Amino acid sequence: MYFHMEDVRDALLQPNLSDEDVAESTEYVDGLAARLGVSPERIRTPVAYPIRQLALFYALMVCARNASDMTSGRSMEAGDDPYEKKRVVYEREYMRWEARISAETFTGAEGKDLGENFPLTAKVGRG
């Protein structure tokens, strides 16, 4: 498990988050590490913030998907189901965090943690 249950602040999903959802999230993150060539024993402890966020948002997305009426075969509009709305939001978030993670994020090699893109610069002009 890559996050703490205390990190779950979503009032709608928190009571529904199951051990199976968390296990699926853990398997997903382990699979990402394997795709990046990182073996389980090389994953640093504690894990980096981007990995915790990825695992959390993936677990919440799975929880919302499982609770959604859209997956039960009922004929509904996507906008009518609060769980489906949450699923869409959390799917977007886990994909955003996944794009920021590299092998170095898992291992902490050379002090790199590519999950954060700092410093940021932006051109500012009048116009």
Can you say where each PLM-predicted feature lies in the sequence?
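Short loop/turn elements at secondary-structure junctions
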Residues: 61-127
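Elongated alpha-helical scaffolds
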Residues: 51-62
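Conserved short "hinge" loops at termini or chain/domain junctions
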Residues: 1-51, 102-127
